[in-house]
Amino acid sequence: PDNYGGKYFGKVTLATALAKSLNSVAAQLTMEVGPNAVVEAAHRMGIQSDLLANTSIALGTSEVTPLELTSAYVPFANGGYKPDIHFIRRVTTADGKVLYDSAGGSAPRVIKPEIVGMMNSMMTGTVEV
């Protein structure tokens, strides 16, 4: 696969690869850990769509909804916890009777705190390059 900008950089860290949008590194990492591990991680992060477990998944070849994609990034800003998303929080009648209330619950941690810190640091690098 081509990298953003069409250049290859040789051996780089994952932080540099993320900052420079190096697709070749994403593909290599997927081959190393295996496509099934990528799919499992995506599902753990909140992606619910069916994903094809192949090496091209690193390039975004499986379709997901915008909500899934957005919610998959939330654990990085939320201490590793998966979001408990509700669009409708409460439904009441005109006189105030509650028909529905989404009290929410405690969301499960889906990423270890040390991984959250590393990823946040690497994602910050994407805007500092």
Which residues does each predicted region cover?
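A penicillin-recognizing enzyme superfamily signal
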Residues: 16, 63-129
